[in-house]
Amino acid sequence: MSQLVVQYSFDEDGLLSRVTAANGGGENWEEEIIRDSEGLKIEKIFSGGIRMTRTYDAYGNVISQKSRSFRQDGYDRRYAWNASGRLQSVIDGITGGRTSYAYDAVGSLMSARYEDGTDDYRMPDATGNVFRSRDRRDREYGKGGRILRDRHYDFLYDVEGNLILKTPRRGLTQHPNHEVSEESGTHIVWQTGDYAYEWYGNGMLKEVRLPYGKTVRFEYDALGRRTAKLFNGHVFRYLWDGNVMVQEWQYEEKDRPQYSIDEFGRIRMQGEEPVENLVTWVYEEGSYVPVAKIQNGERYTIISDYMGRPVEAYNSYGNVVWQADYDVYGDLRNIKGIRDFIPFRQLGQYEDDETRLYYNRFRYYDPRIGNYISQDPIRLAGNNPTLYGYVEDCNKLFDLFGLDCKANKKQGTLAEDKIYNDLLHNSDVIVLGRQVYIKTPGIGRGRYSDVLIQSKKTGKIINVEIKSGGAVRSTSQIKKDILINSGGGVFGKNAPLDMNGKPLADMKTSNVTSSVRNVPLWEINM
């Protein structure tokens, strides 16, 4: 298998500044990241003369994003946000087309009016079930938010709540929640035009029989990461690094090695597994956002929107080879190029072209109905709208693992954990402490430093303030930071030693600067 070496470089504040991918043959792929004083990414410069720029409002929301190469202008959008931090409108800077969004009283996304004047509804009812019509009459739901019927299909489930049949045939069961089981004497077989779903005992999707009769099968490891997909005589294999897919390849199923179990119970592969059509995905360090696709010696740069969703891909010559927008369900629209050239959708989701389902680690999401096809494995702890529902607003929120809505986590703590762990692994700085108290005489009781670090190069101590999801410092915090930066702050008695072993307790902050790190929600790991 081809070895790709991905290297990450950081600035003196411990922030990612460069990504380099080298496979030993051909040119390297690179990304350079330029930030503003708050640590927000304002420009990215990629191999092939590709650039992406962003501007932000005072709350950290992206208000414009543009990409271009030496050959052509690319993605150009202007964003407007309402007082609640919800996306209000998007204007295409090239065509002038405008998309506007509407929300209900609790902030759930209800609809979009696209640039061509068409309306797309995602109308939630009081329990969180969503409908594609304004009057909410196009669907019928059962317990827990399972969809029973829409304008095209009936949906049938097993006793565990997993979807087992999506069929255009009507009235196949009289069960109030469309449950079908052998025990109850109701077993319905697949017919042409149906989608049939089979499940493993642990709740993972095993296979899907498509309307024309072919079957897609899936395999997983013990962590729920999909390792293989089998379809139409081909094996599609996946390799993971933690929670992100880093490589995939395919070959003919007839060439797949057999497995055996030795006398110690170990699984052995008989022969070498073929590796053909290898694709390598490159991510920014610590995130789920893909930034490059490496295939057959070609290097493709991936541009993502303010949420981290892919919206554009360039080849190494600076030509746009893929581009897309998203609808209110997270499905693609305005597609240019081959749909599955970039298979990533909402963060944590990978689209299967055969089924049009999004693999979302522990569940599969159907963007055509806006629901998962099985119940949340952690049930009510997931805090999603229903047991089958996706997030309330896919313009802002996401569900990385098909378990829970990211915004329902303690964002500040998660952001601090991310930056703290990043800094621990940064060889250019020493982490002195976390939640270190600094007194600010004359301005309140002082403040805590989220993370206190010291640069190995300059010896300067940096008070790192961490914000998540566009949060900003209060006026009081800014005043205290100004005092700290001017040397007027005093380290409290719980202060650590500096990297030379000198106690900082009761010392003035004469060698300290304050720095804000704003972590977008999509860069926060679970």
Locations of the language-model features?
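A residue-level detector for well-ordered beta-strand positions
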Residues: 8, 33, 54, 79, ...
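Generic structural signal for coil-to-beta-strand starts
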Residues: 15, 40, 61, 86, ...
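Intrinsically disordered, low-complexity Ser/Thr- and acidic-rich flexible linkers and loops
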Residues: 70-72, 76, 169-194, 254-273
